[in-house]
Amino acid sequence: MGHCKRSAVALALSFALLLLSLGTNPVLAQRRRTSGPVTNPSTSTQLRAADTATATRARLVLLIVVDQFRYDFLDRFGDLFIAGGLKRMLREGASWTEANYDHMPTYTAPGHATLMTGTWPSENGIVANDWYDRDAQKIVSNVSDPEDRTNSPAYRLFSGGATERASTPRRLTASTLGDELRMTTNGRSKVIGISVKDRSAILPAGRHATAAYWFSTHTGNMVSTSYYFTQLPAWVEKFNQARRADHFIAQPWPRLLQSEAEYLKRAGIDAAPWEKFGNATDADISFPHSFRKNQTADVYTPLDSSPFSNDLLLEFTQAAIVNEGLGQDADTDILTLSFSANDYVGHYYGPYSHETMDITLRTDRQIASLLDFVNSRIGLQNTLVVFTADHGVAPVPEHAAALNLPGSRISNSQLLEAIKAAIRQRYGRKDESKDTTADYVLSLSNANIFFNLAALRRDRISLEEIETVAGDAALQVPGIARYFTRTQLQRAAIPPDDPIARRVLHGFNSRRSGDVILVTEPFRYLETFIPATHGSPYSYDTHVPLIIMGRGLAPGRYNQSATPADIAPTLANILGVQAPSNSTGRVLAEALVVRSQR
C-alpha cells in the first residue's frame, strides 16, 4: 500500500507541472454572461431569484464510467480498494445493488448512449456498436457521420491520422442531460466527454455538447472534430505536444500488489489456458506485461489494453478541468469520463484473470486521484459524482465449460448457412438451377438477421412468414435459445413478465434493427476472435454498479431495482432541469433528500 501511495503522489506532483505548463486559461472571462445595467426593478428581482436557484445547483456533474466493470468486482476486490476511491463513493454516496441494463445488446455504444439520454436503444437509436444500414447497404459505426459517404467528409478530424475519419453524435436520436442543461443555460454550461474510444466520449456528451475528445491510435494524440469547433483548443494542442502516449506505452505492467497470493485467491492462476487464444503466446498472457509501438498505421493500439491509457485519460481530464474552468461558476458543467482500457483487458483475459483484477485495483486508485483533484479545485460538496459501467462481461466460454457450465462459441458461418438452407428449402424453385433465394438475406450482424425487403417483394414473400422460417432454423443450431421477429416486436407482442423479451424489445429500433433477433443460451456467444465478450441479456452482462454521490442524496445502500437509464432523469430532477427528450428511466426518489436543487 505504501508503494501505491507514493506512486499516486509522484503522479500528482509530476502532472501538476504539466498543468502549469498548459496554463490556466482565463475561461471565466471567456464565458458568455448577461451583462449591463439593470433598469427595471421587476427584472432585477427575477434575476436575483434566478441567481438564487442556480446557486443551489451543483457546479459540476462528473460521470465516471469504467468500461466492462461488472457489479461483482465491487465484492470480489472491494477490500483491496483504497479509502479515497470507490470505498469513498460507497461510503458517501447512494449505491444501488440491483442496477441492471434493461436492453439487449449490452455493448459499449448502447450503454454509453443510455447513461445520459435516460432511455434504451429503441428510443435513442444506438442499437449496437455498429449495424447494417439498409440505406447505405453496408455496416456503419454508431458515431460515423450519417452523411459521410464520400471522400469529402462533412467534418474534419483534428490531430488524427491521415486515414482516420471524423466521428460525430448525429446518429443519436434523443437529447442527453447535457443537451438539456445547455439549452437551460443558453449555452453557458459546458458539457465535455472524454475517453479512449470515440463512442464513449461522444455519446454521453450528446449532440449539443461543448466538446468530445478521444485517443488516436495513429498519432498518440487526444483528438476531436470540427463538429464541435473550428480548431482544436490551444490547451489540447499543448497537451499533445507533451507526447504523454510515448511515455505511457513504454511503461511495463507488473502486478500492483506485491503478493501474488491475493491474485490467486480472487482470480485463480495466471495465464490460464483459456486466455491463450488465437496467436497469443505464453508471454502475452503472463505477468509482467510490456508494450511497444506497432509498425503499422495504428502505432499506439497496444496502449489501448494497458492500464496506463487510463493514466493518460486522467491527466487529460485534469487538464480539461483546469483549462476549461469547469465548475467555477453557478452554471453547472458536465464532464463525462470513460475508462476504456478495462474493456480491452477484459476482452483479452476474461473477468476471472489476474489482469482484470489488477486493472480494477489500479482504476480505483485513479478514481481516488481524480476525486482528490476535483475536491481541491471545485469541492466535492459542489459536485455530483456518478460511477457506473456500460455493461458487464461473460466468462471466457472455455473457462465456463471447464467449470461444467454450458460455455461454447457458435459459428456465425454455420448459423447463417442453416438459415439460408431453410429458406432455400421453403422458397426455392426446384425446376430452376439458379438459387432464387440467394439474395434474401443481406446480413447477419450482432445476432440480427436482415432480409432484402426488395427481393421479398419481388418474389411476393411474406416477411412475417420468412421471419419464422429463419428463426426456427436458427433454433436448430446448438446454443441458440430464442428468437424474436420484427413483426412481433413492432406489435410489442411479448409476455409482460418476461425480462429477456423486455430487454430485446428495448433494444429494438424499427429503423435500425434487423428482422429477426437471436438470443443465445447463457455462457454461449456467437463466434468472436477474442477470448471474452458481452452483449447478452443475462446478469453477467447487465448487472453493473450505480453510485451517485453529492448534495441532495442520502448516502446508503439501496436494494430497489434500478437501471443506468435512471441516472439522467434523477440528475435532471436534482438539478431542476428538463429530463432528456426520450427519457424512460425513473427518478431514484428513494435516495433523494430534497426534490430538486431549484
Which sequence ranges carry the predicted segments?
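Bacterial N-terminal signal peptides
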Residues: 11-23
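Active-site-proximal N-terminal segment of extracellular/periplasmic enzymes that hydrolyze or transfer
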Residues: 36-94
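A long, amphipathic alpha-helix that forms part
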Residues: 47, 54-56, 81, 303-329, ...
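Secreted, luminal/periplasmic, and some membrane-associated catalytic domains
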Residues: 66, 98, 107, 129-166, ...
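Short, structured active-site-proximal loop/turn typified by the sulfatase FGly-forming signature C/S-X-P-X-R
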Residues: 74-124, 190-194
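Active-site regions of oxyanion-processing enzymes, predominantly non-cytosolic
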Residues: 188-195, 201-202, 264-268, 310-343, ...
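Active-site His/acidic residue clusters
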Residues: 202-211, 289-305, 328-363, 399-401
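Long, low-complexity, polar/charged, intrinsically disordered or flexibly structured peripheral segments
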Residues: 244-322, 326
